[in-house]
Design a protein with these regions (language model features):
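Internal helical hairpin/lid segments
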Residues: 248-286
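Short internal beta-strands
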Residues: 75-84, 164
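Bacterial Sec-dependent N-terminal signal peptides
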Residues: 1-28
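N-terminal beta-loop-helix "entrance" segment that forms/cooperates
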Residues: 27, 84-105
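Conserved anion/nucleotide-ligand pocket segment
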Residues: 183-254
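Glycine/threonine-rich flexible loop motifs
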Residues: 135-147
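Glycine-rich, charge-decorated loop segments at or immediately adjacent to ligand/cofactor-binding or catalytic sites
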Residues: 88-93, 162-183
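Glycine-rich oxoanion-binding loops at beta->alpha junctions
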Residues: 97-126, 138
């Protein structure tokens, strides 16, 4: 069946408005992220060797949280990077190598390369771990899997985990729950496609549902958001990954990413990723 230009545009338009929250934040008190509440967690870091799972979205104000905490005297001994790397300069699914930060000498350990969770040797160098990465609230966006892997490493090595909570731009629940017979690296938990939770809430669910191996519990402290509601229209201040470079792409991602199971491209590698669809087999102009 040939898809007409009009029907295609209607399809994209419907996806664009589907589940976009109606509550505006312009007249509300500014959302305060977990990372911004320095006075709440700084005492927990005093005199401790700190590891941080962070990337380009990990900011306090307009400064990277790593730099902000170092300026406050926090002893950061290791940085861990998720998919796309600490600087978000790796493509989706690409292996990211370990490196040393040339300015600080702090090791940057990839959790999207040879290993997916911190090793026992990594954890032995830490007293506490921080997780501070923005998420887009989608089951197959790998940050929640990395969070669970970090929780597992902390539980195995009896190390506390502090989570700086951040808003979910897709703060609604939709889509089928994962069939666990189809469990994979991009789908590890029985949750819907869009789960509606913040990263801190998801961590609490992992603990509460006993989803870590052998039903281990991770000692987590969530620095909760202030002035946040799940139905708020929220735009991430920093693009979460190379191919989610606009608010529209973030909102369309849970729907358009499903086309990765077909011959249809979602615009990766173009200047409009996750806002267009196309394939050589499609006839006509769009």
């Amino acid at each position: 069946m040939i898809i007409t230009r009009v029907s295609f545009l209607i399809f994209i338009s419907l996806l664009s408005v589907c589940h976009i929250p109606q509550t505006e934040t312009s007249n509300k008190t500014t959302i305060v992220t977990g990372a911004d509440q320095v006075n709440r967690y700084l005492p927990l870091l005093k005199g401790k060797r700190v590891g941080m799972l962070v990337n380009q979205t990990s900011i306090i104000g307009d400064k990277l949280s790593v730099d902000s905490l170092r300026s406050l005297g926090v002893q950061i001994v290791a940085i861990f990077g998720p998919e796309h790397g600490f600087r978000a300069n790796a493509s989706n699914g690409a292996v990211v190598k370990d490196e040393i930060n040339p300015e600080t000498g702090i090791p940057i350990i990839s959790l999207y390369g040879k290993k997916r969770k911190p090793s026992k040797e990594d954890m032995a160098k830490l007293d506490v771990m921080i997780f501070d990465v923005a998420d887009v609230g989608c089951r197959f966006y790998t940050n929640i899997n990395t969070l669970a892997d970090v929780m597992e490493a902390c539980a195995e090595n009896d190390k506390p985990l502090i989570i700086f909570d951040r808003p979910n731009p897709n703060g609604f629940v939709d889509g089928p729950v994962l069939d666990m017979n189809l469990k994979s690296g991009i789908g590890k938990f029985p949750i819907p496609i869009t789960h509606g939770m913040t990263i801190g809430e998801f961590a609490q669910m992992v603990n509460g549902e006993g989803w870590l191996p052998n039903k281990m519990k991770c000692n987590i402290t969530v620095i909760k958001l202030k002035n946040y509601a799940h139905d708020m229209d929220y735009t991430l201040p920093v693009h979460p990954s190379p191919n989610l470079n606009t608010q529209q792409s973030v909102l369309l991602y849970p729907s358009l990413c499903l086309f990765e199971g077909t011959i249809i491209s979602q615009g990766r590698g173009t200047h409009m990723p996750f806002t267009v669809l196309g394939a050589p087999a499609l006839k006509g102009k769009y």
